[in-house]
Amino acid sequence: MFKRIDHVEIVTDQLDRTVQFYTGVLGFTVKARDRIERSGLGVPIDLVYLDLGGTVVELISYEGTAIEPAPQNEHLGYRMIALEVDDMQKATDFLRSKGVEVVWGPRVRETYSRAEICDPNGYDIELRQWFT
């Protein structure tokens, strides 16, 4: 019946910058692009589908309308996406070389290491290296 999580959606007002970050820094590839001329808000929206290892992130940009930013950090509801990395030190060194700030961690626990970065919209992205 239920097979897998198909995609996660991120609303942005910086579509090109966000696509560049996810593809140029994090290694996602553009799977598809779409434009819907009249969304539920009555304005056109641009969609970019990004793929990483079979998981898709759908970027959504509403044309010409102000959208309230998501609440920061601790709140009820979804909080962040997490990317698994092979080597936390190499991943964080690479991200820093690209000008990406590691805003939390790395913190090493018995079975994993984790750190956090932010995308250009300020959304948290967790990095996780499993040791088992």
Walk through the language-model features, giving the residues of each:
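Vicinal oxygen chelate
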Residues: 1, 92-132
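N-terminal beta-strand motif that seeds the catalytic metal site of vicinal oxygen chelate
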Residues: 1-19, 78-83, 131-132
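Exposed loop/turn and edge beta-strand positions of beta-sandwich/beta-sheet ligand-binding modules
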Residues: 4, 43-46, 77, 111
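Core segments of cupin and vicinal oxygen chelate
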Residues: 9-55, 97
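Residue-level detector of beta-strand structural context in well-folded domains
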Residues: 47-48, 81, 115
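Acetyl-CoA-dependent GNAT
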Residues: 61-66, 129-132
